[in-house]
């Protein structure tokens, strides 16, 4: 409702579904073969609305007339027990809207509660129902889950219920390997993101998506090189498009973010190339900072040459222009003279004038 210059959100009481004859007549509600609600414009009383809520802690109403709280589903008791409990049969409610599984996880982490056993148990079996949710809706849900300032704990709980691989199917095989560099990388990125959010620093969803899909990208690149006989440059760019295309089938990442994801990935290939003016040009790139932060985490997890490269870029940013030239000179000497010189074009000997 528009009230002056403000927009006030108004919630409508929802009622129970009518029988089949009424449904066909009024076309107010509709369910899929999986039991998912496709249309739900059934209006009702406050008591019916309370029964339609997902969790008991969500079925409380504040009356501004007498400042009282109407608790229809023992929500206060659930708060005291620090427990997220479903209203009604959990399996049926999850089938009606599988996103409720994500909401259960999000509320549990956000409120510091546990999910009751009756509410949690069906999630293991019903997690694949997430495939029936529109990809555009899942994008918004993922932002709520991972950009809440508690993304790491949310990820761990999603993974416990096999929900994370439903959101990122290409990560499925990697999530089953304990103590791997892939899992360490994901957890470090989420930890860093949580720290930035909790410090009121700017974050972009593109960085999260770039990190979550980095190792599927590397794996796909290797497949193209081995099976297709492509060089690394062509294989990498083909894999880049493949991985993003597959992910967008599940989560509709807007183009403004996929462009940044591509740039972060592509700059990982350019950061090792520091000869001539390339290092200075790299500093001026709009996405250098994001790509540099990405490289730092890769180096922290994988070590070796990546860690050395990340440290070089850290030092290069912190010294004055004269010292930067010195760093490049040392690099050229260390690499045996630097990048190969451009070959002059052979023109052949001039013929003598006759």
Task: Label every model-predicted segment.
Residues 1-354:
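Catalytic cores of the polymerase beta-like nucleotidyltransferase superfamily
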């Amino acid at each position: 409702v528009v009230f002056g210059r403000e927009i006030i959100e108004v919630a409508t009481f929802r009622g129970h579904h009518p029988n089949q004859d009424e449904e066909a007549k009024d076309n107010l509600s509709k369910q899929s073969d999986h039991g998912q609600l496709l249309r739900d414009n059934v209006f009702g009383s406050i008591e019916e609305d309370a029964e339609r809520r997902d969790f008991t802690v969500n079925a409380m109403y504040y009356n501004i007339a007498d400042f009282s709280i109407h608790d229809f589903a023992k929500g206060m008791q659930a708060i005291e027990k620090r427990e997220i409990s479903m209203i009604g049969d959990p399996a049926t409610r999850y089938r009606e809207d599988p996103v409720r599984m994500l909401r259960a996880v999000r509320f549990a982490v956000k409120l510091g509660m546990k999910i009751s056993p009756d509410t949690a148990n069906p999630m293991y079996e019903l997690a694949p129902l997430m495939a029936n949710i529109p990809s555009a809706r899942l994008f918004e849900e993922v932002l709520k889950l991972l950009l809440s300032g508690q993304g790491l704990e949310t990820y761990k709980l999603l993974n416990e219920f096999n929900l994370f691989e439903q959101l990122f199917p290409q990560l499925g095989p990697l999530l089953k390997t304990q103590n791997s560099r892939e899992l360490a990388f994901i957890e470090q990125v989420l930890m860093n993101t949580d720290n930035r959010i909790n410090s009121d620093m700017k974050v972009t969803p593109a960085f999260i998506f770039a990190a979550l899909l980095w190792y599927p990208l590397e794996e796909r690149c290797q497949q193209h090189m081995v099976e297709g006989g492509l060089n690394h440059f062509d294989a990498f760019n083909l894999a880049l498009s493949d991985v993003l295309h597959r992910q967008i089938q599940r989560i509709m990442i807007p183009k403004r973010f996929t462009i940044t994801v591509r740039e972060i990935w592509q700059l990982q290939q350019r950061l090792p190339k520091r000869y001539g003016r390339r290092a200075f040009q790299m500093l001026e790139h709009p996405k250098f900072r994001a790509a540099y932060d990405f490289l730092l985490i890769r180096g922290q997890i994988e070590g070796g040459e990546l860690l050395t490269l990340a440290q070089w870029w850290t030092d290069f940013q912190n010294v004055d222009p004269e010292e930067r030239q010195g760093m490049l000179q040392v690099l050229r000497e260390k690499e045996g003279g630097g990048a190969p010189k451009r070959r002059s074009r052979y023109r052949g000997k001039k013929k003598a004038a006759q």
